[in-house]
Design a protein with these regions (language model features):
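Active-site rim/loop-helix segments in enzyme catalytic domains that contact anionic ligands
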Residues: 6-115, 144-145
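Metal-dependent de-N-acetylase/amidase catalytic core
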Residues: 2, 8-24, 82, 87, ...
Length: 226
C-alpha cells in the first residue's frame, strides 16, 4: 500500500540515519531532476549516494546516432555526478525501449544486491513516459524480491507532463542546495535544460516549497508494506 496523505510530513527526520542511497532514474538527468537537492542533503548527513541510470539516453539527441548520443549523455551524467559528489552507474537498457522481462528483473536485482542500499528513490509509477514506468516497476519488484531490505521512495519528473496523479506525503527543503542542483542539472547541455528549469523546476520546486513552508522543496511518497 502507498502512504496516503492523511497529514503533511514536512519534517526531515525521515532522512536521517541512511548509509547508502541509490537514486534510480530512467535516463541521464532524471535522478538530478527528481531529487538532486535531496541527494546533496543526504550526503551532508553522511550517506553515500549513487545515481543509477537505467538507459544512457541513446534516443535523446536529434541528429545523433544511438552510439553518439550514448557517449555524449554518459559524459554529461558523469559531469553532473562530479558536481554532486556522487557515483554514477549505468545499466544496459535502451532509451525509448526499456523492457520488463526476466533478464531485466535479474539486472535490477543484481544491482541492489551488489550495492546493498538502505534507501532507494525512483520514479513514481504513473507516468506518461514508458521508460519511467518500466524503471519504477523494476525497482518495485527488486524491493519485493530482495525481501524489502531497503526503504523505497518515489519522486516526480515534470509533473503534469510526465509524472501523473502524484500527491506527496514527504518533503525536503532544498533551498540551501538548489544552486548546486541547478549547476548539476545544467551539465546535461544536450537537453536544453535552461528551458526546462524556467518552465518546470522554478514553478514545481516553489510549489513544493509552499506545501512545506520552504522556499524550494522536493517531494516524495514512501512505498509501504502491510
Amino acid at each position: 500500500l502507498l502512504m496516503l496523505p492523511l497529514s503533511m510530513q514536512a519534517g526531515e527526520k525521515w532522512l536521517q540515519g541512511y548509509k547508502k542511497v541509490l537514486v534510480i532514474g530512467a535516463h541521464p538527468d532524471d535522478p538530478e531532476s527528481m531529487c538532486a537537492g535531496t541527494m546533496l542533503k543526504l550526503k551532508a548527513m553522511g550517506a553515500e549516494v549513487v545515481a543509477v541510470y537505467l538507459t544512457s539516453g541513446e534516443a535523446g539527441i536529434v541528429g545523433k546516432t544511438h552510439e553518439q548520443a550514448r557517449t555524449i549523455r554518459q559524459a554529461e551524467a558523469r559531469k553532473a555526478c562530479e558536481v554532486l559528489g556522487v557515483r554514477a552507474v549505468f545499466l544496459t537498457q535502451t532509451d525509448g525501449n526499456a523492457e520488463v522481462n526476466k533478464e531485466r528483473y535479474a539486472e535490477m536485482k543484481a544491482l541492489i544486491e551488489a550495492e546493498q542500499p538502505d534507501m532507494v528513490i525512483t520514479h513514481w509509477p504513473i507516468d506518461s513516459h514508458r521508460d519511467h514506468r518500466v524503471c519504477s516497476i523494476l525497482v518495485y519488484d527488486a524491493w519485493r524480491m530482495t525481501g524489502r531490505g531497503f526503504d523505497l521512495y518515489y519522486s516526480e519528473v515534470m509533473t503534469g507532463m510526465q509524472t501523473q496523479n502524484f500527491t506527496p506525503t514527504l518533503w525536503v527543503d532544498i533551498t540551501d542546495y538548489r544552486d548546486k542542483k541547478i549547476e548539476a542539472y545544467l551539465c546535461h547541455e544536450s537537453q536544453e535544460i535552461d528551458g526546462v528549469i524556467k518552465e518546470y523546476h522554478d514553478t514545481m520546486e516553489r510549489m513544493r516549497g509552499m506545501e512545506c513552508q520552504a522556499k524550494y522543496a522536493e517531494a516524495f511518497v514512501q512505498q509501504l508494506w502491510k
